[in-house]
Amino acid sequence: MYESRTISGKKFWFWLSIGVNIGFLGFFKYYNFFAASFADALSLVGFKTNPWVLSVVLPVGISFYTFHGLSYVIDIYKNRIKPERNFIDYSVFVSFFPLLVAGPIERATHLLPQLQQRRRFDRAQMTDGLKQILWGLFKKVVIADNCASYANMIFNHPADYHGSTLLVGALFFTFQIYCDFSGYSDIALGTARLFGIELLRNFAFPYFSRDIAEFWRRWHISLSTWFRDYLYIPLGGSKGGMWSRIRNTFIIFLVSGFWHGANWTFIVWGALNALFIMPLIISGKNRHHLEIVAQGRFLPTIREAGAMFRTFLLTTLAWIVFRAANINQAWEYIRKIFSRSLFTVPEVTPANVMILIIVFMLIEWWGREQPYAIARLGLSSPRPVRWMAYYAILAAIFYFAGTEQQFIYFQF
């Protein structure tokens, strides 16, 4: 593609590469979904079919390394980078083990130069990496795995519980998915730092966001910016009229939902987030709140606290659809939450897990201006305080660890 002397030749190799990458992803991840959906559509008009479906295990992390490859090809096509002649360097870029199965989604322009330069051991970088790994393990093992036990129990049998308990289950899943995914990202970034590699940041305290637009600038940052650079902007971005902005916003959120999995729940989840962000797009306020909340202050204002609470509730509502097994379950789950049973005493109230969540959120708030929460320990804290904190976190990992749960994003 790079050496093609004609535009048509360049386009041929470009679209061939795009087709091969997306073809593998579509075949393994979406074939059964489309086959079943097509059969359901035919049954509505009276035709009964038994579609052939795949009985294969989805390759772990296929959505992530497919996007690595796509960004590489697109950047070459746009003349942002030159093709990598060293096959080993290219292979490491696509399959660097810390990010292979669950991201972050790297760019060739960011990672390849780091792989090609000579690296030297950096004690400060190593120490910082170990701290981030420690915090990631705490988030995954202590918060996410404990929340998962109760979230799974409630979501698997929603008909057995009152609306108040279903709300508790939704809150548990809200913290589970954040601590599970951001915990993995912390471990990946910390591990890469041990090898002298700086990966893209993937989370920036999203639950302290004051609106949905800010939330999506802070949640799964590598995916959000990927869709912005390789889909939203090529579609015209925000340069066209209001209708173009609305259309492009819906496209990226629907595609983002579909990227997560072959289930209508993910597509509806993407559409919900597009609806939530639409008032900000229409009013031109989607670029507000670029800095972290309460910058340089310990406490937020009442207005900021209210905005964070409202955004958190909208996010929790969307996570219900994301977690549900199907659209019918999501609808019944939400309908029951907004029934009179919401005002009953919850049947599931694990005080120990709730206390752990509160402590966790206080630490996150304390360190929200840093790349990760406990990075602040290395800035001004005396050595005895730092080591006491590290050992306390390590002890919590062993003492308060929940039942082992697979990382949620391994399925994507």
Model-flagged regions — what are they?
Residues 1-411:
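Membrane-embedded transmembrane alpha-helical bundles that form the catalytic cores
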